[in-house]
């Protein structure tokens, strides 16, 4: 995060005197900085924290200390990153005051025109960034996005055809017996995803997670010798399991995936291909993963967080083919109680940033640095997982 030339220590000193009394850091910064050297990012950051410090100086102090920590330490946690001050500014505003259940032009509350514009802009930016038919930008976290995607698939492939069979469209009109039968169908579908201990995520069918309670969940693993995905073995298992959803993507697998091959497997076993790209979405947006390594070209539904490699606010999105758009848009109220308008605004800003040449350069450097780190580790005698 670039907020000017001040060091974290100098920034902290703007807020508190030695006796702990809260100062006016914005006034201090502006009075001590020549006009031509005033940094607008610094002004925005300090102005925000000045207001926080007026009410909760301890919280302002903790925020500045976290800034100090992030500036002084190299983070090697794969799921963490740094979002821009532009993104942070978009998130800290009065949009948080607005309820907006539903989706653009289909809200439960009135006066949502501005939120509609924000959400529509974020969705259009996401569609352009990833080259997809539809984007749903409401989910608050990757786990939420996965559950929205799961239920969208269940709605499209199980619920809607079942209702059509009995000539009904409204769930409220079902008899108790019809409702029980539908619930049984929805709760007995199969999911095939990457095993948790092979690098899959909790939400990919791990038994301690709700995903394994929603589905009859099965897992494929990496090859025990190479540590790599064995696509032929996955295909064989998929043909045996016949899952409704074939889930690709990972939380801790350090290689690119051949999504074209997964598409072939899904088509052969009759499954919907879903991809969770939360940990590498930035490499897709940055044009590092292209062709068969770009899940957006092959999957029916793709989910991702917006932080991690996307460098946006903490949140998530669901991307899909037009076939699933209507079902995905039912995420609220099916799964979500409502969107966070201020976070959707920040997502829009982050997506705009990710469409720049500078972002693509950064994304390619991520891969280059990872490869150099791997080489150096090998030269030092370390055994890499793959």
Regions found by a protein language model. Give the residues of each.
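Conserved PLP-binding catalytic core of the aspartate aminotransferase-like
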Residues: 11, 383-386
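Aromatic (phenylalanine/tyrosine) cluster motif
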Residues: 15-16
